[in-house]
Design a protein with these regions (language model features):
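N-terminal beta1-alpha1-beta2 submodule of the flavodoxin-like/Rossmannoid cofactor-binding fold
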Residues: 1-106, 174-196, 210, 250
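Residue-level recognition of beta-strand->loop/alpha-helix junctions
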Residues: 8, 39, 159-160, 229, ...
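Short, structured active-site "lid" loops
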Residues: 52-75, 240-266, 270-280
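A short, gly/pro- and small-residue-rich
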Residues: 93-107, 145, 262-263, 270, ...
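Short, glycine-/small-residue-rich phosphate/pyrophosphate-handling segment
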Residues: 109-154, 310, 314
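Phosphate-binding/catalytic loops
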Residues: 126-133, 163-167, 280-322
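Glycine-rich phosphate/pyrophosphate-binding loop and the adjoining helix
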Residues: 138-194
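Conserved active-site segments centered on acidic
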Residues: 192-261
């Protein structure tokens, strides 16, 4: 299922920005999607040091909860930020999260790596301010534009409410609430129409990971791609990162999954077995395909490149055939 990631940026509990997110996410009840929500005030996120470490290494040197957030950004199909306006910008807690996304910007623009979901991921901001200034949301719009670009998402704009200060006061604006619900439906609807494809191999450490990434990159608007294995490793094989980096795709924040972890997404429209040396688990699906691909792990990198290119070709053929 598609993942909707909701982020509340207010340092205050129960305020208007939380109400906006609640109303927006109510539209997911009837949609077949997953929802995960967190408040930045509950996280320990240090401010960016401006040290440029991420520009050289591709990851942040600071060790805190931001590491978990990076992974969530990469899993999400839609990122929704709900925030109050503080001096025409984000509150400090949310600004720290935005600044720390420099690490993802570095992976894209310094290392030349694209997240496979980035062509299709979307981001939107719900904002509420106590005043009614003509340019009340200008600062947030500019920051959001570059933040969403950094995490690999198309910025869908700010849905803003002006003149609300008391907790939950914004609920009284019925016209705004209607517009908010309608925009939520518009953003959620395409995610519920995609066909689900599962790629399966034994360890979910190489072939199935590459297939998932290629389908996400080339056809993420029409397909929801997943991958899993019946004996998953703890980490993706290092060669897989190298092979996909040669194609400009970034798998750094991904982990192998057990087949049981994705059964909640069943049934699948298509299940593709990559070529199991032992026995791949059976999962609920409408159609099953066997690709019989060689396992490149433990073999020369040239073998890995041949398998990778064959997977890419097969994914493109799959897209052309639908």
């Amino acid at each position: 299922m598609a993942l909707i990631l909701g982020i509340t940026g207010s340092p205050r509990k129960g305020g208007n920005s939380e109400v906006l997110l609640e109303v927006f996410l109510k539209e997911t009840v009837e949609a077949t999607v997953k929802v995960e929500v967190f408040s930045v005030r509950d996280l320990k996120i240090s401010p960016c040091l401006g040290c440029r470490f991420c520009e050289e290494k591709g990851f942040c040197k600071l060790s805190d909860q931001m590491g978990e957030i990076y992974a969530l950004f990469k899993q999400a199909d839609l990122v929704v930020i709900s925030t109050p306006v503080f001096f025409y910008g984000f509150p400090a807690q949310l600004k720290a999260l935005v600044d720390r996304s420099q690490a993802l910007w570095s992976r894209r623009y310094k290392l030349g790596l694209r997240d496979p979901k980035s062509p299709w991921r979307k981001g939107v901001v719900l904002a509420v301010g106590a005043t009614k200034g003509e340019r009340l949301f200008l600062g947030i719009e500019l920051s959001s534009k570059y933040f969403f670009d950094a995490i690999g998402a198309h910025f869908e704009g700010v849905i803003g409410a002006k003149g609300f200060d008391r907790p939950r006061e914004v609920l009284g604006d019925e016209d705004f609430m209607y517009r908010l619900r309608q925009r939520a439906k518009e953003l959620l609807f395409p995610l519920t129409r995609r066909k689900k494809v599962l790629f399966v191999c034994k360890h979910n450490a190489c072939r199935s990971q590459m297939a998932q990434a290629f389908l996400e990159f080339y056809g993420g608007d029409r397909f929801e791609a997943l991958s899993a294995g019946d004996d998953p490793w703890k980490e993706i094989h290092p060669m897989t990162f190298q092979l996909m980096a040669e194609k400009g795709l970034d798998l750094y924040f991904r982990k192998p999954k057990h087949i049981e972890d994705i059964l909640e997404d069943a049934p699948f429209d298509l299940v593709v077995s990559m070529g199991c040396e032992v026995s791949c688990p059976m999962v609920p699906g409408k159609r099953f395909v066997q690709w019989d691909l060689e396992d490149p792990i433990g073999k020369p990198i040239e073998v890995g490149r041949e398998v990778r290119d064959l997977i890419e070709k097969k994914v493109k053929e799959l897209l052309e055939g639908v």
